[in-house]
């Protein structure tokens, strides 16, 4: 036991320091930056993979198991700590996981290559810890671009346009046994509950209600009975939940719903093709990464909602 402590003692200290460094950056940069910052999503994970290895000896650095396992252990413990103290929710950590684990490992391999071949003083690598605090203010000076993305989902329904139309203009309360909750619902994405409309015409206001009290305020911008309906979407700020993910995304000026539309197309076999299209806007310097997750989550949501409409219309 004493030999193990002597052999891995410094490495364990390095892991603890790495976790502490990760928590420090999370507190300094705040929740608004975690999903929208180049520094937080790409630079910090790389450094986090290096920090514990600064306390490893050359024999430990030569072990590829250590180069992979130590950064992963550091990141995993860092994530677990943030989850337990309520800094992040599971869905946030899922989104962060790819860059943190991959870049942490890459950083560790780069450190191994430099340290073993060049025998650089490990003290010099400590300056790496300052890089995020120098880059983040510079990143803030660069205006974040805003891009709009579109998601399309379709379903073929054996029902009349009238029956389908009645199930999309207004949505009666959706029972739990009607909506098949998926992975994303279980980790924090609210499921739809109902939708009401004050006037079934152009300019009418539609209210989309979700689990947990979240409400979408929707204004009808196109209305063609039994053919097409479009509406803008705004999140009611009073309905945004206090959980970390909603505050990150819906109150962070990072993700914004733009509009949605339903389009019905008659098919030659008497069935109807129903298309649900949604547009959303991302404003960050890593819109490509936000789009990756935005598309996955919205596609899952739309497909599940269309399944409810299909089932109700075919009764």
Write out the residue ranges for each language-model feature.
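Hydrophobic ligand-binding cavity/cleft-lining segments
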Residues: 2-34, 38, 42-50, 73-81, ...
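Glycine-rich portal/gate segments that line the openings of hydrophobic small-molecule binding cavities
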Residues: 4-9, 22-70, 100-104, 186-259, ...
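Membrane-interface elements of multi-pass transporters and channels
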Residues: 27, 31, 54, 58-62, ...
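Membrane-embedded alpha-helical segments of integral membrane proteins
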Residues: 64-115
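Conserved short-loop catalytic and cofactor-binding motifs
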Residues: 94, 152, 248, 293
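A conserved amphipathic terminal alpha-helix motif
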Residues: 97-123, 254, 260-261, 273, ...
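Intrinsic-disorder/low-complexity, polar/charged segments enriched in Ser/Thr/Lys/Arg/Asp/Glu/Gln
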Residues: 148-156, 205, 215, 228, ...
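A short, structured loop/turn motif at beta-sheet edges
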Residues: 157-162, 221-228, 263-274, 310-315
